[in-house]
Amino acid sequence: MRFVIITGLSGAGKTQALKAMEDMGFFCIDNFPPALLPKLADLFYHSKNVDKVALGMDLRGGQFFEDIYSSLEFLKKNNYDYEIVFLEASDEVLIKRFKETRRKHPLSEEGRIVDGINEERKRLAEIRKIANSIIDTSNLTSSQLKEELSNIFLKGKKFKGIIIDIMSFGYKYGIPLDADLVFDVRFLPNPFYIEELRPLTGNDDKVKEYVMKWEEAKEFLKKLGDMIKFLIPYYIREGKSQLVIAIGCTGGKHRSVTIANALYEFLKKEDYSVILHHRDIGEE
């Protein structure tokens, strides 16, 4: 489980950072109240469906400071790992950004932006000290900020501009509505009709060996991998940040799971950022 808190100075890019985290497969919530952090942590740390969470937090308010420290203490006591990313920028850049958007700084009571920035720096000094990562966005574009975050949260891999989400599914439960590419692997021999394989899934070695022993399975996987590699640069060129690839068989337990797993491993070796999940593996 990866639990990330994104905070920092107003105008430093928290919203853009959360968008980048979402593109990297994180479940994101903006403007999250610190007092609710313990309940959310309990929920997600016991969930099998979410393994990466990023929360945008505005910590300017007085009560929020007490809430954040007590909430972080709760996480520590319960051995919930978390990371804090603190975003900042120079006074000159922050002033320019506020003027361009014609927004008033939330802490500038008399209307002077620079006074609000100075006050906010003081209030956030303590949380900045305990941050795991501090990013100065003064000279960063949105794409460069995404690159910085990817260097931190994608295990050192270079972010190639797109997240590939591979999903297995069963046609009997419907085609995924969010799929960009759908591949039907029902042409492959079905392990369902092998009695000893029926209760297993494509995550089991016996099923994997059965599916992948056929030449058509090997050839399909090779051609599928080559095609995806060919397409990815063009999707990136069109500005796509996430590509959802759905692979289906009848029930979503055997063939589709095996092929989805194999495609996931292939693209990981190519150093792409890949997410894998099996939508219908628990259905009967």
UniProtKB/Swiss-Prot annotation:
Family label: Belongs to the RapZ-like family.
Binding site for ATP: G8, L9, S10, G11, A12, G13, K14, T15
Biological role stated in the UniProt entry: Displays ATPase and GTPase activities.
UniProt-listed Pfam families: PapZ_C, RapZ-like_N
UniProt keyword annotations, A-Z: ATP-binding, GTP-binding, Nucleotide-binding
Chain positions recorded as GTP binding sites: D58, L59, R60, G61
PANTHER family documented for this protein: RNASE ADAPTER PROTEIN RAPZ
Full protein name: Nucleotide-binding protein Teth39_0666
Entry GO MF terms: ATP binding; GTP binding
